[in-house]
Amino acid sequence: MTEPRTPEKLLAAKPPVLHHNSHSPNASLQLPSPIITRRTRTASTSARALENPVVTGMVKSFSRTKGHGFITPNAGGEDVFCHVSDIEGEYVPMPGDEVKYRLCAIPPKYEKHQAVHVQISHLTPEVHHKWEEPFYGGSSPAK
């Protein structure tokens, strides 16, 4: 019988291995390599992610143009990478949004984790944009 997987054990197992040449929306954060998207994730990896508990955190950064961001887990530990394909719901995440998600091990070594099935549970008071709204590179068009 295997030991239950808790968010603390998943995050503390090994620190994420980061690609040294990757850049993220926040200069101090590094992107994992390879980046696994919902489309490229295998069925078995997706099934394992669904076995993991739902955890909570806060969006640290998210770039709609780059298609990724990072979540700071409420339980502490390393910030978790999040790909745009794993965001569920109608709103684009913004820094400060509270989210719930599951951790998914990233192949081939399954040492790193990323956030999947990400749902915004509490929006920041700032104006949020829906995915279907036109995007103008961070600024609104002149009226």
Swiss-Prot record:
Entry keyword set: Phosphoprotein
Source species, domain of life: Eukaryota
SMART domains: CSP (SM00357)
Post-translational modification Phosphoserine, affected residues: 22, 24, 28, 33, 139-140
UniProt-recorded Gene Ontology molecular function terms: mRNA 3'-UTR binding
Keyword Phosphoprotein in annotation: yes
Residue span, CSD domain: 54-121
Protein name: Cold shock domain-containing protein CG9705
